[in-house]
From Swiss-Prot:
The coiled coil domain may be involved in oligomerization. Its main location: cytoplasm. Residues 374-698 are annotated as: Necessary for localization in cytoplasmic stress granules. This is Protein CASC3. Residues 134-280 are annotated as: Necessary for RNA-binding, interaction with MAGOH and localization in nucleus speckles. It comes from the Eukaryota. It comes from Mus musculus.
């Protein structure tokens, strides 16, 4: 298009100039304007027409150059595109014209040769152009040179311009395929680049750093490739690093304590350490260092168990310690109380029922004072020695951290444990279990029923679970009465929770060593009598805690602590035992009958375990979770209420002495559903509003 426009414009000029410059007529117009400082159209010796050329200077020059468009034309920078600004095509620009100039210059020689060779053709073409000025102006030349300069120029010019026609497509500025090779933007465009290398002279490269010794530190040295001798290794590292198989040769390492204590079972190296540590809770008394958690394990020596039992079951029994001290007090007496307290508080904290339990120690003190407790304590101590659970360490571990975990994870298990191992006081349970004559004591301790050895720890955990879960929620209700709270708390809190665990554990532990919860679960079966104990605990509910301050303290409070005790229930059953037997007659027990003499279970009887579950679970309507058990002999304790207790998932609240008791164990049976997970929603990517889109597109 541009070419044609140019052609037409030049043709007009040609017509006017045809007379003036015979053969050059077309040339000046087109060439004249386009020549930027060189011969305009380049006709040989054509006189430039002032009109055709934009600058007379150009034409004069051309005239001077006058003649063949050879040299001059080559100089002429084919700017005929620049003839008139209006004529410029869309693709053409000053830059283009400059490019054309370059091209014409480059091809000067070609142009000269062609012009000379094509003189005849030029003349004929010019004639044609003159003849058909209105035609496309030398059609022959028009399309022969692809640079657009052919249109109105005489063939000579066109011949001169034919050079550009031979340009490659990528070199022809007017060709869409033109690849610019100059200019800032295109300096990195390497398409079809042939002379870019020459164009960009490479500056000499300077070394900014020296590479001479660069890899000295890492050089491959043949002499270093052989294995080092032992002497070299020792000189280098201080010991023979290759003698891993020979421990003696290995550099001794400082033994570090595990940062996050792992269970002694897992970390045999620290078992000794751990056990002592665990006993550190036991309190000032060093006698029972293991006892602190041992009982819970039902591990450790019987004595430890016993003392622990006291602390556990009677830990709250600060006063009790005095009684205990009779038997146990001597060894554990002071320690028991203190330790129990520590332990109790420690455990309570653990159990989440801390607040309730902690208070209990004080209230318990009076309760502890009761002779029953004393009896239990004395019995328990003896029993404890019998039950010498050998795994104090393990209990410790479990108590400290497994229990919490378990309580959380095994709510169901805890309930089961409660059924199986109601006794709250593990230590007592274990002690009671061992001594056959200490059924009463056991009862008092509640822990006695539990087999010290069996699964004290496991039971402990299970009980804890139950106690913690069912207990803590309902505990407040049971514990509401200060006394109740105090007593049961005591039991639960001070040592109650621990005792519970102990009891459960001990029930399990009956075998004499700490067993896993599963084992204790199985073990409990042998102890059907336990249910009575459990009942007693439940009955404890019955008794007014106030009424049975001493012996019943637990039972009276039982309601509150019951949940945990519920697990301990069997021991609870025993609970009454010491005082209960004595107190059994006392009216304080709402159901003395229920509370048969502690149903003194045989000391070894783990009945509490069974009893436990049934007992506290059985609390169907009555608070006696172990109601059926009252009359049963320790061994004869009916296994019973358990089923019914499960059925009564929600035992109706019982009101005794103006206190409403709920069976936490039963309440706890239903695990609290976890809140529904929030459905993860992917981040929604929304398209921009249409307005934005339209704006962008527009």
């Amino acid at each position: 298009m541009a070419d044609r426009r140019r052609q037409r414009a030049s043709q007009d000029t040609e017509d006017e100039e045809s007379g003036a410059s015979g053969s050059d007529s077309g040339s000046p117009a087109r060439g004249g304007g386009s020549c930027s400082g060189s011969v305009g159209g380049g006709g040989s010796g054509s006189l430039p027409s002032q009109r055709g050329g934009r600058g007379g200077g150009l034409h004069l020059r051309r005239v001077e150059s006058g003649g063949a468009k050879s040299a001059e034309e080559s100089e002429c920078e084919s700017e005929d595109g620049m003839e008139g600004d209006a004529v410029l095509s869309d693709y053409e620009s000053a830059e283009d014209s400059e490019g054309e100039e370059d091209y014409s210059e480059e091809e000067n020689s070609k142009v000269e040769l062609k012009s000379e060779a094509n003189d005849a053709a030029d003349s004929s073409a010019k004639e044609k152009g003159e003849e058909k000025p209105e035609s496309k102006g030398t059609v022959t030349g028009e399309r022969q040179s692809g640079d657009g300069q052919e249109s109105t120029e005489p063939v000579e010019n066109k011949v001169g311009k034919k050079g550009p026609k031979h340009l490659d497509d990528d070199e022809d500025r007017k060709n869409p395929a033109y690849i610019p090779r100059k200019g800032l933007f295109f300096e990195h465009d390497l398409r079809g680049q042939t002379q870019e290398e020459e164009v960009r002279p490479k500056g000499r490269q300077r070394k900014l750093w020296k590479d001479e010794g660069r890899w000295e530190h890492d050089k491959f040295r043949e002499d270093e490739q052989a294995p080092k001798s032992r002497q070299e290794l020792i000189a280098l590292y201080g010991y023979d690093i290759r003698s891993a198989h020979n421990p003696d040769d290995i550099k001794p390492r400082r033994i570090r304590k595990p940062r996050f204590g792992s269970s002694p079972q897992r970390d045999p190296n620290w078992i000794g350490d751990r056990s002592s540590k665990s006993h550190r809770h036991q309190g000032p008394g060093g006698n029972l260092p293991p006892r602190t958690f041992i009982n819970r394990n039902t591990a450790g020596t019987g004595r430890m168990s016993a003392s622990r039992n006291y602390s556990r079951s009677g830990g709250f029994k600060d006063g009790r310690t005095s009684f205990r001290p009779v038997e146990v007090a001597g060894q554990h007496g002071g320690r028991s109380a203190e330790t129990l307290k520590h332990e109790a508080s420690y455990r309570s904290r653990r159990l989440e029922q801390t607040p309730v339990r902690d208070p209990s120690p004080e209230p318990d003190a009076p309760l502890l004072g009761s002779p029953e407790k004393e009896e239990v304590a004395s019995e328990t101590p003896a029993a404890v020695p019998d039950i010498t659970p050998p795994a104090p360490d393990r209990p410790i571990e479990k108590k400290s951290y497994s229990r919490a975990r378990r309580t959380r994870t095994k709510v169901g298990d805890a309930v089961k444990a409660a059924e199986e191992v109601p006794p709250p006081s593990e230590g007592l349970a274990s002690t009671a279990t061992v001594p056959e004559t200490t059924p009463a004591a056991k009862t008092g301790n509640w822990e006695a029923p539990v087999d010290s050895t069996t699964g004290g720890l496991e039971q402990d955990v299970a009980q804890l679970n139950i106690a913690e879960q069912s207990w803590s929620p309902s505990q407040p209700s049971f514990l509401q009465p200060r006394e109740l709270r105090g007593v049961p708390n005591h039991i639960h809190m001070g040592a109650g929770p621990p005792p519970q665990f102990n009891r459960m554990e001990e029930m399990g532990v009956q075998s004499g060593r700490a067993k896993r919860y599963s084992s204790q679960r199985q073990r409990p079966v042998p102890e059907p009598p336990a249910p009575p104990v459990h009942i007693s605990i439940m009955e404890g509910h019955y008794y007014d805690p106030l009424q049975f301050q001493g012996p019943i303290y637990t039972h009276g409070d039982s309601p509150a602590p019951l949940p945990p005790q519920g697990m301990i229930v069997q021991p609870e059953m025993h609970l009454p035992h010491p005082g209960l037997h004595p107190h059994q007659s006392p009216g304080p027990l709402p159901n003395p009958g229920l509370y048969p003499p502690p149903v003194s279970m045989s000391p070894g009887q783990p009945p509490p375990q069974q009893l436990l579950a049934p007992t506290y679970f059985s609390a169907p309507g009555v608070m006696n979770f172990g109601n059926p058990n009252y009359p049963y002999a320790p061994g004869a304790l009916p296994p019973p209420p358990p089923p019914h207790l499960y059925p009564n998932t929600q035992a109706p609240p019982q009101v005794y002495g103006g206190v409403t008791y709920y069976n936490p164990a039963q309440q706890q049976v239903q695990p609290k559903p976890s809140p529904p997970r929030r459905t993860p929603q992917p981040v929604s990517i929304k398209p921009p509003p249409p307005e934005v889109v339209s704006r962008g597109s527009s």
